Amino acid sequence: MSGGAAGPAGPTDAAGEVVGAWLPASLAATGPLSGSGRTLRLLVPGLREAAAGQHVDVRLTADDGYQAVRSYSLSDVRASAGGAGRVPEIELAVERLDDGEVSPYLVDAMEVGDPIEVRGPIGGWFRWPPTRFEPGSAVQAVMPDPLGAAPVDAAPVQLIAGGSGVAPLVSMLRVRGALAEGPEFRLLHSVRDPASRWFADELDGYAAAGVAEVTTFFTRAAPEGGGRASGRLTERELLDAALPAERHPVVYVCGTNGFVARVAEWLVAAGHDPTRVRTERFGGL
């Protein structure tokens, strides 16, 4: 498959933003991720600046004209604005699915210089810094800031990821890490084993530099001396490690359908404001 010609403007996303036209892009660089993952750095002329947490649609076109479209989270948006003669650049993090239609090509076959099409960025809700709505606006009337809470764009940030769901949260950490100062960040990452931990060295670096507190829970195999046996993340463990509800954090949860549903339920039951629990999910339990 290859990238085809740009198509008509797309629909609006869930936040009412225009998704935009299909844009021709090309692979500029790639790198391995733990397990069966790969990062893809794409050059996308004409792309509008992306926010951390957003995603894009990608489209592949076969020689017979058949097209396949999939959505992938952005793991790096820092160069998405382009400017000063630079072409806008984004990074995707893609996990290879054995029965997938698009991911095997992206992970195993796509080479530097190969074309692809991109539409987006998409997502007005799952993004950091979050959009701040002015007092008296229609959105604030429906979803006011919790009593005594800092404005949403100044609130502490809790990131919670299951497996490859860490990708859009890494984009948030990269933006936060580039700031001289900013709100407190914490990341909780539930992952099968150390070998499946995406961006491990970078995340450990953020923890060492004080950018974020990082806690990892291994579900299948834990490292020796880690202090916790392997096993599924429990409600008690999550609530003990996460920022407490009384601090009114903005919480971003990304993972499989089942993981996100469980975590969101635990958070709301513990008193977290539902308007500050923001979720992104993909197939699976």
Spell out what each predicted region is.
Residues 53, 165, 256:
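Short, conserved phosphate/pyrophosphate- and ester-handling motifs at nucleotide-, phospho-/glycolipid
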Residues 159-162, 253-254:
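Active-site-adjacent beta-strand anchor residues
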Residues 1-15:
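Low-complexity, intrinsically disordered tandem-repeat tracts enriched in small/polar residues
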Residues 11-122, 132-133, 191-193, 218-220:
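Ferredoxin-reductase
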Residues 166-178:
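Histidine-anchored nucleotide/phosphate-binding helix
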